[in-house]
Amino acid sequence: EKGEFMAVYYLRDRFELLDSGTFWLSETPDKVSRGWDGACNRTVTWVELKDRKSGKEFFYFNTHLDHKGKAAREEGVKLLIEKIHEIAGKKAPAIVGGDFNTPVDSPIFKPLTKYMVSARAKAATTDHKGTFNGFGSAPDTIVIDHLYYRGKLKCQLFATLDGNYGAPYISDHYPIAMVFTL
């Protein structure tokens, strides 16, 4: 009924949760809803965290754009940007990550890359592995999962976590990660 859940996991001994919320990628983001030409109800879950060591704060937005609707992906990115400005302001450090169901060179990212940078492209250490595996049925070159950031963050590492975790595939996507400093 409500659609998918975009979980955000964090180390509670390292970070303090200051605020959190969810919105739907649709024309009515505050209501359970399916947007534009989307096949599914899609959401964004966000958190505001405070680093217990440094006292610095940042925002993280986790999303999953629609896999079928092109307009849903395009409008979803625009809404995501609007909500980041509304929730985090225009300057606070922020990270956006998730399954965008869109290759990195797609024009869908143009509005996002006007004020955020790709962790994969800017990290001091990165990889060029595919992120979608289709439970073994897809070529290992498809990259549709992304991390973007803005503000006073420095990205040291971007990694596609394609190791064996006790099963050949834990999902149809490999997890992605970034290591950063505030």
Regions found by a protein language model. Give the residues of each.
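Glycine-/small-residue-rich active-site loops that bind phosphorylated ligands and cofactors
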Residues: 1, 68, 101
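Structured beta-strand-rich core segments of catalytic domains in phosphoester-bond hydrolases
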Residues: 1-57, 160-161
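Conserved hydrophobic/aromatic beta-strand scaffold that supports enzyme active sites
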Residues: 6-8, 44-48, 62, 146-147, ...
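Metal-dependent phosphoester-hydrolase catalytic domains
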Residues: 14, 71, 75, 85-94, ...
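Metal-dependent phosphoester/phosphodiester hydrolase catalytic core
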Residues: 39-41, 50-74, 78
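Active-site flanking residues adjacent to catalytic metal/cofactor-binding acidic residues
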Residues: 63, 97-99
